Structure formats: structure tokens, C-alpha cells
UniProtKB/Swiss-Prot annotation:
Residues 506-523 have a biased composition (Low complexity). The keyword Phosphoprotein applies. Residues 10-42 form the LisH domain. Residues 45-102 form the CTLH domain. Enriched in the nervous system (at protein level). The gene is Wdr47. It comes from the Eukaryota. Transmembrane segments: none annotated. CDD domains: WD40 (cd00200). The modification Phosphoserine is found at S289, S292, S297, S312, S423. This is WD repeat-containing protein 47.
Length: 920
């Protein structure tokens, strides 16, 4: 033994000891916070297991069930047991939300949370091990609090989630193991090792003190040896050296052969008494203030200061040099429980900066309409329309902004007191936000009554002539505009870009036609087409365009709509240059189903569901992202042979990267120049891949952004107005914010807050405008020049509204289309500020909507496994021709038009992505 020895101690191992201790004492809130801050996890897990663990700890139960789908086909995997564990945890958390609200005397909101709990219980029935287990779960519904049950006396969400993972980890460890060459011995602290080391350290200090007393002649009795133990301050023997060991080594061997009495050490531990406030705050904070599924509870951060700070720290407003990509995150969102897979499939969009190519997907005036010989065409029933402004329009999110310098940090002396008041402050903030929401509801009710009164006053008598109808309609609209102006509702910040609606009415009246509709949205007047082309020549939208094209966007001509348009199959007149003739068909043509308008050309099959597809702006490539974490870039065929549809070929894969993300790829998007490919995933990361379209290879390291604290549902690009670089727009679950990122500088720009539910869809146009669709049943328009929300469009025109799963804006920037979870599509006049029509093209969730580059057709994909095209070349206030153009064997997730040809891509849960083309 040398005079100096070295002992290696890793701080990571010390943290693992602490994590093991916190886990053994069920202090899981502190354990998870330490994991997040240190980045250390006590255990040896594979990447897949770590990802599954994070999903469970975040409470993303639908994501967990989807992640584990590949294992469910294996016989050894206990699918029933796994689903029982996950759904039971989901049910208990729903009960926790309900109980917390009932404890706060909010009976008017119980129906929302109780409905969620009952749905979870219903799903659990088929997976319960026995009827007794199911009966016990049913009994929990009758208790005023979940913690009143003896089995759940100390239940809290954080501890329950940790135990949930430990239980399922044993089940899936065999299928997704860690490195088999490694042992957990060097990676995991266990058996309460920290406590053992503390006790051994105390005994060591006692031994040192006793030996020193013997050497110096100081008398210490045997009973006094352990009396001087001080765990916090020690006994003065603080020097870390090997003197004791060196002394023992110099003792003769005969000393160790002496007989001695073996003594037992009894350890009495005074257990920690947790404060009751801490436990109750834990029940309330993660599940009520952020994750509650009902609208009266804020679904974002429970403390408004965080949201205020986010808004006040905009670089454009405060001159900061960087964005908010690294601001603190809270645990992920559990709210907005919806139908299966409803928030799993995001849509992606791709902005373009060039004009359309010469073919314009065969939409020019020299091509035949795709509806001329369609065997599956149908007319969509039009719901009762209300030609009024949107149900909800407001500036920003409705919360008052507070400057960043307005919040003063508490002095250290008051820090402990402030921490004790956290729970009370959260309650106060919750009630403040609830009051704001109630005031908002009262305002909406007043607007609804006003609209109803205006309809009664301005209703059109069917016996009146068309001229009188026109006058009544104009009077009604003028009163609507006046009332809405008084309520300060609208997109005032857009200025001259929003024409007055009554001027549109006057223009329609002066056309000389007997049109009973207020405005023809199908086409602008002929004499204004050049002006519109000039206005939109430089518009950049999320629709990809051909870089080499110089042609202008063609616009439609006005189509007069007389009373004959009310027939079952309306006659829609084509534009003057269209050679397609009359688009209506005879009964014989309707019965002929032998000819398909669109046929399958290429089909790519994956091992799991394919979520995301995106055409390169040039149209020569398209990107595919799937649940298997694989990113592919495929070649678009140079020659389209529609006659070979009976035997579709596999596309040529030019680029492939396995495990591009740790989780499923939810969305993909190309930059306007086509040199960047962005992907979003449920691993909460956005990756931007520099890509060379000519060589089909990555040209540099990936850019990785981690500003989101939930699944990224959608991505879109727009060209930066100042730097010329690509600006990435991303949104999803978690904090429900929209983030803008300068990809050239790798810096965050803005964090746009306002939505109160998962953001499912994004779309960009005009170089600064963004449309977002959300689980909160609204569409919001954002102007990056401000930057803030400039308009809110609700979906509650009919019934209770529905979550918005997809949004799109036509190339002219005049018309918004939405796809919603109640199987409906909404067409909304952006400039006029009113809904044009809401119709139901599908029988299930509409997950994808896209305008063709010429805005002649609207492509929709749905969970009903069908892909349909709506003809927009007529009066959009009337019934619209509809045609089935494709079908999958499972849910359709995304559909995207080609940039030039009359072709489109569709992705599906049947694990395929299909390229369809017009058969002519």
C-alpha cells in the first residue's frame, strides 16, 4: 500500500443513489424533478424502453398503446394485461380530476370529467382479469375522493405513473432489452444503497473516534461510543484519509484472532411525515390546472406568469437576440381526451415561393373536368348556413399581457414562505382564469342572441322575388357588419387586405345576374382577374410549387347561380375557356362505375402505420415518415402510366434513414427552396435535415430543436422576410404553443400562445400568416409581423363544434378549409369574415384537407378509409359535387397534391403510402 491512494467517485452514481432513495420513500415528484435537471436515470434501459418510460411519465396513454402495437401480434406478449395496466391508470387519473373539482364545489363541471372517467371504465371492461376487479373499479365512481378508498389512500399521479412503468417494464423487457453485454450492476443503484452507506459512514466515524481515544488515553465507555453520532454535522473526524486502515494493517495478526462478542445494531428510523398540502397540491397541479379535459380549467400552465413571460420576451418586441427555445417546460399534457388516434396524426404543410407550373394539375381551362365521367360522384348536403362573421374572433388569447420586468424575484428570506403558498396561488390563478372564461362565454351568448335576432329581422321570404331577396340579404349583412364593428370583432390588423363585405355584395348585385347568393366564391369577376393575379403573384403558401414556373395562378370566372341550382344534381357551368362542357351527368353515366378517375401508380409498404408525406417543391421527390421511425425520400416517376394501375410498382427509394427519431414520425415538411427537410415526432424533438435534391443525400449534420414538451403534430415552413432563410413553424401537444425558428441561425424567434388544446394542424401563406387548428375547436390566424393572434374562428356554427384536425388556405389567401373530427369540412371566407358552408363529405374524422394549386378542387382524407375530391368550380354556398378518388384498407391519415401534375399522395394506418394519378 502506497502513501497515497486514489478512489474514483462519479457524481452520476451519487445521483443514482439519491434517485434510488427517493424511489424507495415514494418521493417521486422530487425524483422526476431530479431526473429532469440532471439527465440521469437510475437503471439500464434501451432507447425504446426509455422512450416508453417517458410516454408513461408524461401520461400520454394513447401514445403508449400505439407505441406498443408491434408487440401485440406476438403470442408471448400479454396484450390484455398490458392494456389493463395502462387503461386503469388512465381511469384513475380521470377520477382524480373529477374528485378534485367536486372538492372545490364545481358541480356544474362534473359531467365533463365524469364522462371521461366512464369512457375509460367502459374500455377497461374487456381487459379486466375478473368481474370482481371490474366491480371494484366501478365502486370508485361512487366515492367522493379516490383517496377515500383504502387501497388508494396515498395515491398520487407521479407515484402511480412510476409504478405503472415498473409494472409494464417487466412485461416488455424481453422484447426491447438493453445491451445484453452489460449488467445492471454498474448502472443501477438498488437495495437502498444510500441508506446503507450513511450508516456505515457513521460507524466509521465512531471507530475513528474510539481508536483516537485509546491512543490518547482518553476514557470512553462502551455505552458512550455511539452517543456522539451526529448525522448532519459529524463528530469532528472530517478528514478523508486512510490513517485508520493504515493503523489496522500494522497491527499483529494475533490481535484479530482474539475472541469477541458479536453485537447486533438496531436502527430506528424516524420516518418522514409528508405535509398534507403537498399531497393535495400534487393531485391538483398536474391534472387540474394543466390537464383537465373540460373547458373551464386552463389546459396550459397553471401560473399565468409563465404565459405572460412567454409573450413579453418576443425578440421582435424586446430586441432579444434569441428566442424562447430553452424556456422551462412543465410535464406533458394529458388533456383533450378524444377518439382513438385523434391527436396522433398530425398534418404537415410546405410553403412555396414560386408560381405554379404550366400544367397546374390539369386544372387549366383546356382540360376536362375530373367530374365529367366520375362514376362515384355525389352532391354534398349543405347544412343550414348563417352568413355571419365567425363565432369567436378576438385579438390574442384574451389574457392581459404583463411586461417581463414587472415580475420581481422574491427575496431569499421569503422563499420558503412563497413555496408554502404555491398551492394557494395555483388555486387563485385557476379561479381567475375560470372567471375570464365565464366572461368569455357570456359574451359569446350575447353574440349568439344578437345573431338570432338579426336572422329573425333579416330573414328572406321565399315568396319574394330575387331582387327583394337580394335587398333583404344586403340589409342583413350590413346590420351584421355594423353590430360586429361595435363588438370590435374582426381582423383589424390586416388593414386594407380585408375588403368590406357589403362592397362584395354590391359587386355581386351589379353583375346583372339574378343570383340569390350574396357572393360567388367560386370565381372573381373577369375584369378583376388580372388585379387578383397581380395581388397573389408573390404569395407564399404551404402548397409546394415548381421553382421553374413563371405562369400566373389561374382564377375562376363568376358562375351565375339561378334558382335551378337547387335541384338534386346542380348544373355548374365551367369557365368560358373550359372545354369540359356541362359537368352534370346523365343517370346512365352515374350508374357506370367501370371507369376510375384516379388510379394507383406506386405503393410503398412499411412495417407500421405511415403518418406523414410531403412533396419536394420541385415535384421530383417526396418524403415519407412512419411509425417505424424511418424517414424515406422516394422518387416521383418521370412517366405516369395510368394503364398499369392493376399492378402498382414500388417507388424508387433514393434516401432512407432508420431510427431517424426515437419515436414515431408524425409530420414532415420541405423548406421553400427544397434544401431542408424537417420532421417532428412524439419524442418531442424537431429535426431539420440539410438535403441535396440532386444527389439525394444529406449535406450536413442535423439541426435538433427541443423547445416542445409534447408531441409535435405539425410543421410548416415559410421564407424569412429579412434573412431570406427558412423559418420553421412547429406546434403540437404539451404547452399548446406555436414556435417559430430561424433555421439559418438555429435560433428560436417566437412562442405564440393562445390555444387551450392540442394543436393538430398548421398552414402558412403570404409570407407572414399562419393558420392553426386545435383540439379546442377553434382555428386561429397569426400574423408574424405583430406577432400575435389576429383572429379566432370557432367551429360551433352548428351544434357544439368539433376539434380541427386539418387546415388549408387556397393560393389566393381568400378561402379557408378545415377538416374536423365530427366528419365535417368547413369553408370560411377569410376576407369577408364569415362561414361559407359546412358539409359532411365523410362518415368519420376528416384528417386531411388540401386545395389543389389552382384551387379548383379540395382533397380530403378521412378515418372512413376514403379519399374524396370536392369540386369548387361552382357557387360554394350551394351543394358541391363530390367524388371518391381513392381508398385504403385502414384509416387515411394524410393526403397531399403534387406540385404540377393531377396526382396526389395518401398515407394510411394500413402501413402504406400510395401515389394516385388522374387516369384521363
Amino acid at each position: 500500500m502506497t502513501a497515497e491512494e486514489t478512489v474514483n467517485v462519479k457524481e452520476v452514481e451519487i445521483i443514482k443513489l439519491i434517485l434510488d432513495f427517493l424511489n424507495s420513500k415514494k418521493l417521486h415528484i422530487s425524483m422526476l424533478a431530479l431526473e429532469k435537471e440532471s439527465g440521469v436515470i437510475n437503471g439500464l434501459f434501451s432507447d425504446d424502453m426509455l422512450f416508453l418510460r417517458q410516454l408513461i411519465l408524461d401520461g400520454q396513454w394513447d401514445e403508449v398503446l400505439q407505441f406498443i402495437q408491434p408487440l401485440e401480434c406476438m403470442e408471448k406478449f400479454d396484450k390484455k394485461r398490458f392494456r389493463y395496466i395502462i387503461l386503469k391508470q388512465k381511469f384513475l387519473e380521470a377520477l382524480c380530476v373529477n374528485n378534485a373539482m367536486s372538492a372545490e364545489d364545481e358541480p356544474q363541471h362534473l359531467e365533463f370529467t365524469m364522462q371521461e372517467a366512464v369512457q375509460c371504465l367502459h374500455a377497461l371492461e374487456e381487459y379486466c382479469p375478473s368481474k370482481d376487479d371490474y366491480s371494484k373499479l366501478c365502486l370508485l365512481l361512487t366515492l367522493p375522493r379516490l383517496t377515500n378508498h383504502a387501497e388508494f389512500k396515498d395515491w398520487n399521479p407521479s407515484t402511480a405513473r412510476v409504478h405503472c412503468f415498473e409494472e409494464v417494464c417487466v412485461m416488455v423487457a424481453e422484447f426491447i432489452p438493453a445491451d445484453r453485454k452489460l449488467s445492471e450492476a454498474g448502472f443501477k443503484a438498488s437495495n437502498n444503497r444510500l441508506f446503507q452507506l450513511v450508516m456505515k459512514g457513521l460507524l466509521y466515524e465512531c471507530c475513528v473516534e474510539f481508536c483516537q481515544s485509546k491512543a490518547t488515553g482518553e476514557e470512553i465507555t462502551e455505552s458512550e461510543v455511539l452517543l456522539g453520532i451526529d448525522l448532519l454535522c459529524g463528530n469532528g473526524c472530517d478528514d478523508l484519509d486512510l490513517s485508520l486502515l493504515s493503523w489496522l494493517q500494522n497491527l499483529p495478526s494475533s490481535v484479530f484472532s482474539c475472541a469477541f462478542e458479536q453485537k447486533m445494531l438496531n436502527i430506528h428510523v424516524d420516518k418522514l411525515l409528508k405535509p398534507t398540502k403537498a399531497a393535495y397540491a400534487d393531485l391538483l397541479t398536474p391534472l387540474i390546472s394543466k390537464l383537465s379535459p373540460y373547458p373551464s380549467s386552463p389546459m396550459r400552465r397553471p401560473q399565468s406568469a409563465d404565459a405572460y413571460m412567454t409573450r413579453s420576451l418576443n425578440p421582435a418586441l424586446d430586441g432579444l437576440t434569441c428566442g424562447l427555445t430553452s424556456h422551462d417546460k412543465r410535464i406533458s399534457d394529458l388533456g383533450n381526451k378524444t377518439s382513438p388516434m385523434s391527436h396522433s396524426f398530425a398534418n404537415f404543410h410546405y410553403p412555396g415561393v414560386q408560381n405554379l407550373s404550366r400544367s397546374l394539375m390539369l386544372e387549366n381551362t383546356e382540360c376536362h373536368s375530373i367530374y365529367e365521367e366520375s362514376p362515384e360522384r355525389s352532391d354534398t348536403p349543405v347544412e343550414a348556413q348563417q352568413p355571419v362573421s365567425s363565432e369567436a374572433m378576438c385579438q390574442g388569447s384574451g389574457l392581459e399581457k404583463e411586461p417581463a420586468n414587472g415580475a420581481q424575484n422574491p427575496v431569499p428570506a421569503k422563499q420558503e414562505k412563497n413555496e408554502l403558498r404555491d398551492s394557494t396561488e395555483q388555486f387563485q390563478e385557476y379561479y381567475r382564469q375560470r372567471l375570464r372564461y365565464q366572461q368569455h362565454l357570456e359574451q359569446k351568448e350575447q353574440q349568439r342572441q344578437m345573431y338570432q335576432q338579426m336572422l329573425l329581422e333579416g330573414g328572406v321570404n321565399q315568396e319574394d322575388g330575387p331582387d327583394q331577396q337580394q335587398n333583404l340579404t344586403e340589409q342583413f349583412l350590413n346590420r351584421s357588419i355594423q353590430k360586429l364593428g361595435e363588438l370590435n370583432i374582426g381582423m383589424d390588423s390586416l388593414g386594407n387586405e380585408v375588403p368590406v363585405l357589403n362592397q362584395q355584395c354590391s359587386g355581386s348585385k351589379n353583375n346583372g345576374s339574378n343570383n340569390s347568393s350574396v357572393t360567388s366564391f367560386s370565381t372573381p369577376p373577369q375584369d378583376s382577374s388580372q388585379r387578383l393575379i397581380h395581388d397573389t403573384a408573390n404569395i407564399h403558401t404551404s402548397t409546394p410549387r415548381n421553382p421553374g414556373s413563371t405562369n400566373h395562378i389561374p382564377f375562376h370566372e363568376d358562375s351565375p347561380c339561378g334558382s335551378q341550382n337547387s335541384s338534386e344534381h346542380s348544373v355548374i357551368k365551367p369557365s368560358p375557356g373550359d372545354s369540359s362542357g356541362n359537368l352534370s351527368r346523365s343517370k346512365g353515366e352515374e350508374d357506370d362505375k367501370s371507369k376510375k378517375q384516379f388510379v394507383c401508380i406506386n405503393t410503398l409498404e412499411d412495417t407500421q402505420a405511415v403518418r406523414a408525406v410531403a412533396f419536394h417543391p420541385s415535384g421530383s421527390l417526396y418524403a415519407v415518415g412512419s411509425n417505424s421511425k424511418t424517414l424515406r425520400v422516394c422518387a416521383y416517376p418521370e412517366k405516369m402510366d395510368a394503364s398499369a394501375h392493376d399492378n402498382p410498382k414500388q417507388p424508387v427509394v433514393r434516401f432512407k434513414r432508420n431510427k431517424h427519431h426515437k419515436g414515431s414520425i408524425y409530420c414532415v415538411a420541405w423548406s421553400p427552396c427544397g434544401q431542408l427537410l424537417a420532421t417532428g415526432s412524439n419524442d418531442k424533438y424537431v429535426k431539420v435535415l440539410p438535403f441535396n435534391a440532386e444527389t439525394c443525400n444529406a449535406t450536413g449534420p442535423d439541426l435538433e430543436f427541443s423547445m416542445h414538451d409534447g408531441t409535435i403534430r405539425d410543421l410548416a415552413f415559410m421564407e424569412g422576410p429579412e434573412s431570406g432563410g427558412a423559418i420553421l413553424i412547429s406546434a403540437g401537444a404539451g404547452d399548446c404553443n406555436i414556435y417559430t425558428t430561424d433555421c439559418q441561425r438555429g435560433q428560436g424567434l417566437h412562442a405564440l400562445s393562445g390555444h387551450t388544446g392540442h394543436i393538430l394542424a398548421l398552414y402558412t401563406w403570404s409570407g407572414w400568416m399562419i393558420a392553426s387548428g386545435s383540439q379546442d375547436k377553434t382555428v386561429r390566424f397569426w400574423d408574424l409581423r405583430v406577432p400575435s393572434c389576429v383572429r379566432v374562428v370557432g367551429t360551433t356554427f352548428h351544434g357544439t363544434g368539433s376539434a380541427v384536425a386539418s387546415v388549408a388556405v387556397d393560393p389566393s389567401g381568400r378561402l379557408l378549409a378545415t377538416g374536423q373530427e365530427d366528419s365535417s369540412c368547413m369553408l370560411y371566407d377569410i376576407r369577408g369574415g364569415r362561414m361559407v358552408q359546412s358539409y359532411h363529405p365523410h362518415s368519420s374524422d376528416v384528417r386531411s384537407v388540401r386545395f389543389s394549386p389552382g384551387a379548383h378542387y379540395l382533397l380530403t382524407g378521412s378515418y372512413d378509409m376514403k379519399i374524396k375530391v370536392t369540386d369548387l368550380q361552382g357557387d360554394l354556398t350551394k351543394q358541391l359535387p363530390l367524388m371518391v378518388v381513392g381508398e385504403h384498407k385502414d384509416k387515411v391519415i394524410q393526403c397531399r397534391w403534387h406540385t404540377q401534375d393531377l396526382s396526389f399522395l395518401s398515407s394510411s394506418a394500413d402501413r402504406t403510402v400510395t401515389l394516385w394519378t388522374y387516369s384521363g
